[in-house]
Amino acid sequence: MANLKDIQRQIKSVSNTQKTTRAMKLVSTAKLRRAEELAKRSRLYAAKMNQVIAEIAGRIRCNKVGGIDNRCFSKIEDPKTVDIIFVTADKGLCGGFNIQTIKAVKKLLSEYKAKNVKVRLRGIGKKGVEFFKYNEVELFDSVSNLSSKPDKEKSDEFILSSIEDFKDGKIDALYLVYNGYKNMITQELHVSKIFPVDATLYECDEPEKSMLEVEAQDEEKMLDSLVNRYAQYAMYYSLIDSVAAEHSARMQAMDTATNNAKEMVKSLNVQFNKARQAAITTELIEIISGVESMK
């Protein structure tokens, strides 16, 4: 049976770990509340942006012969080069949060590799970047400290090169992969095709009440301008959504760790009591034996 001092040392160590995980859970809970509110507001803006683009694209598709003359809305049958931007956390201790994104990226890589399509992998977040570098997967470029602290200007700059390369025909598709926030206990994986814009986003039906007053001759020019903002905001929103999901995942992971530590302390206390009882029993036997031998 383990030495009493060793067991006491283990109890102290696990108890200290329990205090740490409990504190981390409380910190993540506080951060989650702020991140959740920001994600909700950002989601409304993103939805409105999609609505505006859908309406303008729908108008052009309905009214112009030949449809939309914009590569961002054109169906590309045989892509030769694809950009995949992924978002992971800069830190760990958040359960399977990062690995879900990594698995989705690996799946996309395998699918395009099987079709002999060149993939340019662009990473945001230290954990994902380190994983692919460790596994000798080439990264086109990467950045850290952006997923933990979303910055609109840096986010816009990061995705802008992919937007321009798509418009110039250097790439044929742009994907965004990240783990987003669904609720306090659930994260939702997103694999979004940013370009070409999904045709289901816009329909030919005229809206009952338009939110826009745009002259027909200006619609394509406005659409081209808005499509940049659409992609840039999709990038920025993914960072905000990912932060909320990260705090949610870490809160759950630390809650589980705290509960496990609590159970381990209970188990060690039982083990300690048994060891102490055994030691007392041994001492009593030795005393009784000594007394008996003196008779």
From Swiss-Prot:
Transport listed as a keyword: yes
GO biological process, one term: proton motive force-driven plasma membrane ATP synthesis
UniProt topology in membrane: Peripheral membrane protein
Subcellular location: Cell inner membrane
Pfam families reported in the protein's UniProt record: ATP-synt (PF00231)
GO molecular function annotation: ATP binding; proton-transporting ATP synthase activity, rotational mechanism
Entries under InterPro entries matching the protein: ATP_synth_F1_ATPase_gsu, ATP_synth_F1_gsu
Main location: membrane
GO cellular component labels: plasma membrane; proton-transporting ATP synthase complex
Keywords assigned: ATP synthesis, Cell inner membrane, Cell membrane, CF(1), Hydrogen ion transport, Ion transport, Membrane, Transport
Assembly mode: F-type ATPases have 2 components, CF(1) - the catalytic core - and CF(0) - the membrane proton channel. CF(1) has five subunits: alpha(3), beta(3), gamma(1), delta(1), epsilon(1). CF(0) has three main subunits: a, b and c.
Family label: Belongs to the ATPase gamma chain family.
Purpose: Produces ATP from ADP in the presence of a proton gradient across the membrane. The gamma chain is believed to be important in regulating ATPase activity and the flow of protons through the CF(0) complex.
PANTHER family with a match to the protein in the record: ATP SYNTHASE GAMMA CHAIN, ATP SYNTHASE SUBUNIT GAMMA, MITOCHONDRIAL
Name of this protein: ATP synthase gamma chain
Organism: Sulfurimonas denitrificans (strain ATCC 33889 / DSM 1251)
